[in-house]
A protein has these predicted regions:
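Short, glycine-/Ser/Thr-/acidic-enriched flexible segments
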Residues: 2, 8-12, 48, 114, ...
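Long, contiguous, secondary-structure-rich segments that constitute the structural scaffold
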Residues: 2-104, 108-112
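Cysteine/selenocysteine-centered motifs that mediate thiol-based redox chemistry or coordinate metal-sulfur cofactors
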Residues: 18-50, 154-188
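C-terminal catalytic lobe of FAD-dependent flavoproteins
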Residues: 69-163, 171
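Local cysteine-cluster metal-coordination motifs and their immediate loop/turn environment
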Residues: 175-191, 206-226
Length: 228
């Protein structure tokens, strides 16, 4: 099989993103380019104790977090997080990571039995950062939460729904984004597959455009088709 890894990432976007150091030192004698950017690798599953994500206006404090990857969201930065060690005090851990100050509003929810923790920092009425953590990987979709960063001030409905991670307005939750190029979510893809509207990679591209851009989501689309 093949493993795709973004080769131009650096320490700004990931905790261990400098993968070029692993590339074989076999280069073209003229251009100096590596051997078609090809290197044999061996991979194994990462056995994490928890995983989650944080949305922040600025930078997240990532020191001590075993796995983190940063990407640009809607008026915020999105961090995907995981670690093999469960913090002893989630509230203290989150306050440090999200940059809590005395004047800030702090919302949080914790269910120790299921290993879920959620927190949000509100500053001067607007959402400054939020954190969602789960032991089993069951996390809310990011889209609606990201949209809150565009609001100059959170209304009462948004505040009440914030830690639920779900919009108070009824609508289809398309799930975690699979195709970044066209913002197509997992739930939307599964719906098209289970209803028989997109049973091939080509059909998915025609109906939802997923997989017709950069192509990096094609392996995940194939897995959804195989399991659908």
């Amino acid at each position: 099989g093949t493993v795709f890894v973004p080769m131009h990432w650096n320490d700004v976007f990931a905790g261990n993103g400098r993968v070029d150091a692993l590339v074989n030192p076999v280069v073209d004698p003229i251009s100096g380019e590596p051997e078609f950017k090809h290197t044999p690798v061996r991979i194994s599953a990462y056995a994490c104790a928890w995983q989650g994500f944080a949305l922040v206006r600025g930078d997240l404090e990532t020191d001590g977090v075993a796995y983190w990857v940063r990407s640009t969201g809607t008026r915020c930065s999105r961090y995907e997080l995981a670690d093999t060690v469960m913090p002893g005090d989630w509230s203290a851990w989150a306050m440090i990571r999200l940059g809590h100050a005395e004047a800030d509003e702090w919302l949080e929810f914790q269910d120790a039995g299921t290993g879920r923790y959620r927190a949000a920092l509100i500053r001067a009425g607007r959402l400054e950062s939020c954190l969602f953590v789960s032991r089993d990987g069951n996390l809310p979709a990011r889209q609606w939460l990201e949209s809150l960063f565009a609001a100059p001030e959170l209304d009462s409905a948004a505040r009440m729904s914030l830690l639920a991670g779900r919009s108070p307005v009824a609508g289809e939750d398309q799930g975690e984004i699979v195709c970044s190029c066209f913002q197509v979510g997992r739930n939307r893809l599964l719906k098209a597959i289970t209803q028989g509207e997109a049973l091939t990679l080509e059909a998915i591209g025609q109906k939802l455009q997923a997989g017709t851009g950069c192509g990096s989501c094609v392996p995940e689309l194939k897995r959804l088709l195989a399991n659908g």
